[in-house]
Amino acid sequence: EFKAKENAENSTHVTSGKDGSFSIELAADVYEVTISADGYVDETFEFEMEKDKNYSGEQFTISPELAAGSARIVLEWNAQPQDLDSYLWGNTDKGDDLYVNFRKRTCEGRDGLLAELDVDDTNGYGPETITLNDLNGVYTYSVVDYRTTGTLQQYGATVKVYLPGKSAPTVITLDPNAGVENVWEVFELDHGELKILNRAPAEENLRPGSK
C-alpha cells in the first residue's frame, strides 16, 4: 500500500509477483509504504516520488515471522561504504560462547545452532541478517566498515531488531553525532531486553580480516 502524505488522492496499492517484483505509476508525493505478505512481518517505509522521474531497482526489505524464542538483526545501508560487516558476540546462560561475523557465519552451542549470518554483502546496501536462536544470554552487536574508509559516520547505516512479542522491529539509525569512524557499537541484548548503545567504541578493537 502506498499512502500519500501530501494528497490523499494519490494513494494506491499494488500486488507484487511471486518473486516480490512490482511496477507502479505514482504521482509526485511522499508516500508511507506498507508491505504485507503471508508469513512475514508487516513493514512500513517512507518513499519520496519526484516529478517526472523514473525509479528502477528500488527495494523494500521485509523479514519472515520469528520462531519462538528467537531474534533477528537486519543491517541495511547505502552504496557507500561498500562493505559493512555485522558482528554479534556474547555468552549464553549455559556457558556457550557466541561469536558470528563474515569469517564465522554460524555458531553452534550444546543445544544446536545458536546464531547464523545469512550472507556477507560486499557491494553496498545489504541487507545482512543475523538470526539469534537463544535469547537466554547477554550479547553485543556492532557494525564494522571492512575497508576502514572512515566514512561510516558520513553515509550512515540502519539496523532493525526483531524481537518476540513485538509487532514491529526496533529501528536504530546511526547517530550523526556519535563520532563513529569504522566501528559502530549498536546495541546490547540482555535476555531479550534491548539496550541501544548507538556510539563509537572506546577503542576500535574489532579489526577485519581478509575475505
Where are these regions (language model features)?
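Short, flexible loop/turn segments at beta-strand junctions in immunoglobulin-like
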Residues: 23-26, 132-134
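A short, amphipathic beta-strand motif
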Residues: 1, 20, 71-75
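Intrinsic-disorder/low-complexity signal
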Residues: 51-211
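Hydrophobic beta-strand segments
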Residues: 1-6, 33, 86, 157-159
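A short, solvent-exposed beta-strand micro-motif common in secreted/extracellular proteins
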Residues: 28-39, 139-145
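Edge beta-strands of extracellular beta-sandwich domains
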Residues: 41-49
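Short, acidic Ser/Thr/Gly-rich low-complexity loop/linker segments typical of extracellular
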Residues: 3-25
